[in-house]
């Protein structure tokens, strides 16, 4: 199975249900007044961090995800039901981008952290909502607000808590299979592992994911070999195991083998070499390994402690693992404390009372003269209210005209050269201009 760490999806939130015009019709109540209910809110789409997810594989074939629409309002002041929101569980370390602008919409790092990415539309108001002391029998209603429609790219930047890095055939696959349930393919050739292999262990009721990440070669930071596909996966690991083979058949120059990995990390991103890195020398049971170990120790000049193991025979693997996990818990505690200080657990956009996303609509308009007596007009404010106010009742026509007056619509058309009788198209409607 291919490892999926990036995918593109279209998210379509639900539209709000329409409000209605209705009247109270009861015996002995000659002037019952309005009784039209509001429409329900459309369903929104959320991404939720889930530590049980490890890949975006389950989204591979989901090109479009839709939320349901809110229900229409009903008679007797009955409101339409709100549609249920859609919650999509994704692995921790998932970053959500706007596919068009490349803007980061969500960076998900905490278990059960929720992000609203596509907001459902507000339900339209029924005529009861518009009743006032000045208008006791309003023939006013609204259509539901359109739900958001957005194409997003999901990229998994954190696939594991602990990453195992090293040159091809350092023994990473053998190591991870020695203490986890991972079953990687092993063989003596370059890039045996073409996708990250994940293995899991449990300590103190905590699940810890290890990743055998495909081997680095010189020039990986420029994209050579598996290049960036490898490096991006170690950016957010809590710590790294730098595995190096002591077998002279793998590395005739042990210092060069060590420095290749260190230099590639530095060239890609300096912060990588500042991570906790545990240097583990593997294949100590091979002929010539002790000589290579001594050369490596002299090169490092006691600046870095080396843990010596044989992954194949399981020599010293458990002791090495205990030390690594202790460092992991220390790093995780520091990381979680920083998140609590700087990030809210939930980032929730509140429903607005009358406009989408609780923001002020841009009232700027653009007027295009198509010919001598035909104009098209565009603008966020116009687009929103053209959809919300159906021009099917006299009261709605008056309300829509009030919206136009609030932005000096007629004055701007006159300045653009419009005269009485000209046709004015505003998105889906066409009006006759009156000075």
Swiss-Prot record:
Oligomer and partners: Monomer.
Alphabetized CDD domains for the sequence: Obg
Keyword Hydrolase: yes
Primary role: An essential GTPase which binds GTP, GDP and possibly (p)ppGpp with moderate affinity, with high nucleotide exchange rates and a fairly low GTP hydrolysis rate. Plays a role in control of the cell cycle, stress response, ribosome biogenesis and in those bacteria that undergo differentiation, in morphogenesis control.
Organism (species): Ureaplasma urealyticum serovar 10 (strain ATCC 33699 / Western)
Cofactor(s) needed: Mg(2+)
Keywords: Cytoplasm, GTP-binding, Hydrolase, Magnesium, Metal-binding, Nucleotide-binding
E.C. number(s) listed in UniProt: 3.6.5.-
Residue stretches making up the Obg domain: 1-159
Cellular component, GO, one term: cytoplasm
Protein name: GTPase Obg
Superkingdom of the organism of origin: Bacteria
